[in-house]
Amino acid sequence: MSRRLARETALQVLFQLEMTGESQDLKSAIHKWADEFAVPEGSIPFAEELAEGTLTHKEVIDENLEKLSEGWSLARMANVDRNLLRLASYEILFRKDIPGRVTINEAIEIAKRYGSEESGKFINGILDKVVESVNKKDEKGNDTLSRD
């Protein structure tokens, strides 16, 4: 299973659903994408989990991103960057089995492939703040970022 390919698949489907405004069944959309772009079967469950988790927690994720992305509203961000930040934030906030640094590195590489020339730096800066805020909350028990 390629986790990066699963992340890319989840990103593509989240992007597509947001851009088209479709309320298509998420799993169907992922399987359709996987069939069309020859995504290995082993990558699909992780892609489904990421996309579903991101959509389930979108309101909390967006709230947290708005707090941490000084000078940038989500609406002002490039569509790819916004959806990639949501996806990576889901991992950081809700998937404690994946180290934050791994998530950030993966997001930067995906941003380089799908985003603009500046996307990698932009994504890195905001996700560093997400990880830092989560770490502060874990250490001090304060409520810098909400997870639910």
From Swiss-Prot:
GO cellular component, one term: cytosol
Source organism, top-level taxon: Bacteria
Single GO molecular function: RNA binding
GO BP terms, alphabetized: DNA-templated transcription termination; transcription antitermination
SUPFAM superfamilies per UniProt: NusB-like (SSF48013)
InterPro entries in the cross-refs: NusB-like_sf, NusB_fam, NusB_RsmB_TIM44
Gene3D superfamilies documented for this protein: NusB-like
Keywords on record: RNA-binding, Transcription, Transcription antitermination, Transcription regulation
Record flagged with keyword Kinase: no
Pfam family, one: NusB
CDD domains attached to this UniProt entry: Terminator_NusB
Ranges in coiled-coil conformation: none
UniProt record similarity statement: Belongs to the NusB family.
Stored NCBIfam families: nusB (TIGR01951)
Function per UniProt: Involved in transcription antitermination. Required for transcription of ribosomal RNA (rRNA) genes. Binds specifically to the boxA antiterminator sequence of the ribosomal RNA (rrn) operons.
Protein name (record): Transcription antitermination protein NusB
Species: Desulfitobacterium hafniense (strain Y51)
